Amino acid sequence: MGAQLRVYKRRIQAVTATKKITKAMEMIAASRIVKAQRKVAASKPYATELTRAVTAVATGSNAKHPLTTEVETPTRAAVLLVTSDRGLAGGYSSNAIKAAERLRERLASEGKEVDTYIVGRKGVAYYGFRERKVEDSWTGFTDNPAYSDAKSIAAPLIEAIQKETAEGGVDELHIVFTEFVSMMTQNAVDDRMLPLSLDDVAEESTRKGEILPLFDFEPSAEDVLDALLPRYVESRIYNALLQAAASEHAARRRAMKSATDNAGDLIKSLSRLANAARQAEITQEISEIVGGASALADATAGSDK
């Protein structure tokens, strides 16, 4: 009985130490979510206005440009997958990977080859384990991305969209990331960045009661679009990275809270078992004392006779 009680006590100590760690990680993630939310909110107006500017240029001219011109029969697409560098975030990375797999299957069914680009060690490990080709990858900043990270990611993607497919280029550019909706809701989504769908933007503007402005372009609409292309791709990627970071922190906070709650329940269960073992040990000791006293009394009574 004593050995069993010691086992329970050691397990309670181990679970208590784990609970302290998960509680600390929960609090750290909660504090980082607030900062990430502010960055997301700050980046959205820039990305929105840049998209409107590109749409205004495209609708106000007949220029053919990778930003806005769809290929009649696209044959190759690039997919940028955003995952996390670290684990302990529930199904955050796996949900994004599943969304990327669904997108890849859809593009393949449309007769398009898929070039994969990955952000985050989890995605790199997933594709590496399955020996799948990855065009390029970036790691080390998923929980706190900077605009410079978005620029480094955008560079090879812009180069690919500007090339002909015969030279290794792509006709479409897609991104898969986790959209931050609220502290409790984060959704893995896929979005086509290029070519930009002018009909969707115009429809959204109409729904909001906005009128797209008309411009005169100097020196030309093509030159303006050339200047806007890298800014547009960088801003879209940066906003996606920020939303993914906020989603990662929210998922980690939720996972750590669940782990902390489970640790608390386990401690209660182990404490009950330890108390039961202690009571059984005490009962056994009392029984032994009573039994010994009874035997001694019987022996004494026998000697008196």
Swiss-Prot record:
GO CC annotation terms, alphabetical: plasma membrane; proton-transporting ATP synthase complex
Gene Ontology biological process terms in this record: proton motive force-driven plasma membrane ATP synthesis
Presence of the UniProt keyword Transport in the record: yes
Annotated keywords: ATP synthesis, Cell membrane, CF(1), Hydrogen ion transport, Ion transport, Membrane, Transport
Membrane topology: Peripheral membrane protein
InterPro entries: ATP_synth_F1_ATPase_gsu, ATP_synth_F1_gsu, ATP_synth_F1_gsu_CS
Its job: Produces ATP from ADP in the presence of a proton gradient across the membrane. The gamma chain is believed to be important in regulating ATPase activity and the flow of protons through the CF(0) complex.
Protein name per its UniProtKB record: ATP synthase gamma chain
Primary gene name: atpG
